[in-house]
A protein has these predicted regions:
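A short alpha-helical cap/connector motif
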Residues: 2-169, 175-200, 204-301
């Protein structure tokens, strides 16, 4: 027996399909609008070689975080030099390929991935064991992957000892836990070469909260936040003025005394190490050493 369904009975279904189609059209339009907006407003650094290499490697440093906005001007002077670069948190080593291509004269590139440094099979290994990838990036740029825990002081010290330090660039893209970021900086920054750069990515975790509670036990006004802690580096750099006549005193451990500059950017902090002779400006005795005034027996300072 054939059932005849009146046309009006199909109306809700037809309307529902129309709504779905309309939503899909809106989503497609919004997606196209977002793509167009990205093309129109993307910074000029999106056209840089570094951005392209990181994007092609699948690294979110380019297309999501946009760190290349800052890295291009910082790293471009290093391109042809025999630099030593370390990246912490390399996952499967995707960005390692980009660094090798971007720094063709690099002395050595090191990656640190999470793992047990002491376990069997966790010994340092070549970044690209397969012949195809090795041929693509070139055999002239040594690249070694280590496995270890950046919350372990012992591992960080062992890594510096094994590699010899003297790093020109260190990039912390590891656990993003603020206490790990601070420990890693304090163990590796002494191994950075004079004039070298140290970048801490994903400082967003110092702002995270869940149900009005800091997710990592920190808060922005808590000094254990990496953002709040690094704000104090400005005081360490300017310790000549902060401490009146007590040149050489600093509000932070001595490792911070060798910081020349610090840059705060979107989701990123970059520090540069002093060159030889720079410390004399921060460590000298301030000429206006008593509350900003000259000593009584002097008419000028």
């Amino acid at each position: 027996m054939r059932l005849l369904v009146p046309a009006w009975a199909c109306l809700p279904s037809l309307l529902g399909q129309a709504r779905v189609l309309r939503v899909r059209r809106i989503e497609a339009t919004d997606s196209a609008r977002r793509r167009r907006l990205t093309r129109e407003t993307g910074p000029a650094t999106d056209q840089s070689l570094l951005h392209k290499l990181l994007k092609d490697a699948g690294s979110d440093k380019s297309f999501h975080h946009g760190y290349t906005r800052f890295y291009v001007s910082l790293f471009e002077p290093l391109r042809e030099k025999p630099v030593r670069l370390v990246e912490i948190g390399v996952e499967q080593g995707r960005s390692m390929k980009a660094w090798q291509l971007y720094l063709p004269n690099a002395s050595h590139i090191y990656g640190i991935g999470y793992g047990n440094f002491q376990a069997a099979g966790s010994r340092p290994r070549d970044c690209f064991a397969d012949a195809h990838t090795r041929a693509a990036v070139g055999a002239g740029v040594p690249c070694t992957l280590y496995q270890g825990d950046q919350s372990s002081r012992e591992f960080l010290d062992a890594f510096v000892a094994a590699t010899g330090g003297a790093f020109d660039v260190v990039i912390d893209d590891g656990s993003h836990v603020p206490s790990h970021q601070r420990l890693t900086f304090e163990r590796l920054f002494p191994a950075v070469a004079p004039g070298g750069l140290y970048a801490i990515e994903d400082i967003e975790t110092s702002y995270w909260t869940r149900m009005n509670r800091p997710m990592y036990g920190y808060s922005l006004k808590n000094e254990t936040s990496i953002v709040e802690h690094m704000k104090r580096v400005a005081d360490a750099i300017n310790r000549e003025f902060r401490y009146g006549g007590g040149g050489g005193q600093s509000p932070l451990p001595a490792v911070y005394d060798s910081v020349s500059t610090i840059m705060f950017a979107h989701n990123l902090i970059v520090l540069r190490k002093q060159l030889p002779g720079e410390s004399r400006y921060s460590d000298r005795k301030y000429r206006f050493y008593r509350d900003g005034h000259c000593p009584h027996h002097q008419t000028s300072c």
